[in-house]
Amino acid sequence: MSPIIDALVPMVVEQTSRGERSYDIYSRLLKERVIFLTGQVEDHMANLVVAQLLFLESENPDKDIFLYINSPGGSVTAGMSIYDTMQFIKPNVSTVCMGQACSMGAFLLAGGAPGKRYVLPNSRVMIHQPLGGFQGQASDIQIHAQEILTIKTKLNKLLAEHTGQPLEVIERDTDRDNFMSADQAVEYGLVDAVLTHRSA
């Protein structure tokens, strides 16, 4: 992080028997098993999220992890590293959309533990087909085009599994940018409920 960004991250000071201990707010929330996935999904961010998931599993493999998502999407391979880790680890990963979960963000939102995927009421969710661009020789472009189609098929099959929608519906609905409100995301099966208040 840049020094300017570091200065904007709040610090939390706790009193312990051994004196004061200060944490940045994200580290303090990590103690409560809360992980933030915000901004563009890319390799560096994915590595941090994966490391936090693995750390929390080692701390307690039987306690839920909460993944808060506010993302416009990003790299498919970076997103799949997070997704595969979510499925691999023992704790349930509860996903919560705040703001937006678009593209790979929506895919990760849907990949949370069944019954534990949530969206806040004024958030938006967007699904679409993977994007790609490549330059080079015609044969290389053809190889990359085929790879994008393979990835598209894989993502559609996984979305069908997580939403309960037929594959042909997913294929149709991801053909172009498809925005949904919180209630529409629940109806579609991307999430299980809209959260308006914390339960008592």
Curated annotation (Swiss-Prot):
Recorded catalytic activity of this chain's protein: Hydrolysis of proteins to small peptides in the presence of ATP and magnesium. alpha-casein is the usual test substrate. In the absence of ATP, only oligopeptides shorter than five residues are hydrolyzed (such as succinyl-Leu-Tyr-|-NHMec, and Leu-Tyr-Leu-|-Tyr-Trp, in which cleavage of the -Tyr-|-Leu- and -Tyr-|-Trp bonds also occurs)
InterPro entries xrefs: ClpP, ClpP/crotonase-like_dom_sf, ClpP/TepA, ClpP_His_AS, ClpP_Ser_AS
CDD domains linked to this entry: S14_ClpP_2
Protein's UniProt keywords contain Lipid biosynthesis: no
Record-linked Pfam families: CLP_protease
The keyword Disulfide bond appears for this protein: no
Cellular component terms (Gene Ontology): cytoplasm; endopeptidase Clp complex
Active site per UniProt: 103 (nucleophile), 128
Major enzyme class: hydrolase
PROSITE patterns: CLP_PROTEASE_HIS (PS00382), CLP_PROTEASE_SER (PS00381)
Any Gene Ontology biological process: protein quality control for misfolded or incompletely synthesized proteins
Localization, UniProt: Cytoplasm
Disulphide bridges, residue numbers: none
Keywords per UniProt: Cytoplasm, Hydrolase, Protease, Serine protease
EC number: 3.4.21.92
Family per similarity comment: Belongs to the peptidase S14 family.
Function summary: Cleaves peptides in various proteins in a process that requires ATP hydrolysis. Has a chymotrypsin-like activity. Plays a major role in the degradation of misfolded proteins.
HAMAP family, sorted: ClpP
Protein name in UniProt: ATP-dependent Clp protease proteolytic subunit
Organism from which the protein derives: Vibrio vulnificus (strain YJ016)
Phylogenetic lineage: Bacteria, Pseudomonadati, Pseudomonadota, Gammaproteobacteria, Vibrionales
Name of the coding gene: clpP
